[in-house]
Amino acid sequence: MSACRYRVMVVDDDPALLRLLSMRLSAAGYEVAALESGEKAIAQVAIFQPHLVITDLRMDGMDGMALFDLLHRRSPALPVIILTAHGSIPDAVDATSRGVFGYLTKPFDSKDLLEQVTKALRVTGEQELRRDEEDVAEWRQEIV
């Protein structure tokens, strides 16, 4: 699947990093929604319908894990990548055990980020394909 088919929501309260992430992802061919807070992300998620969310861990108001928890309740298959300048092994273990797809510490290499994005979207695409195949199999059963 080409990158242009994918929508990525980026959430960070640092405007400079938000611009940088948006530029890098857009240059890689993704459609990007850049939002400054978890609250704004929740308000826009149903409209933008992202295939992936990348969020800062520590933000004023709703932090990245609270955002993840809300998104995960609504759409468990939606992959989320957490970015943080305050990374620790216990935080990473907690995040991944709760279902976060990836966890990157700032500063991060753009190549590492794009690799995580590609992996997350590949998994999402494979899950969608399996669901489609199951739907087709069900449909065939109904018409036989």
Per-region residue spans from a language model:
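Charged docking surfaces used in two-component/phosphorelay signaling
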Residues: 19-27
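Short hydrophobic/Thr-rich beta-strand motif most characteristic of the beta2 strand and flanking loop
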Residues: 29-36, 44
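Acidic catalytic/metal-coordinating carboxylates
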Residues: 36-40, 63-66
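Short amphipathic alpha-helix used as the core "switch/output" element in two-component signaling
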Residues: 43, 65-76, 94
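Active-site beta3 strand of CheY-like receiver
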Residues: 48-54
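Receiver (REC) domain active-site loop signature in two-component systems and cognate sites
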Residues: 59
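C-terminal output helix
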Residues: 88-90, 104, 108-118
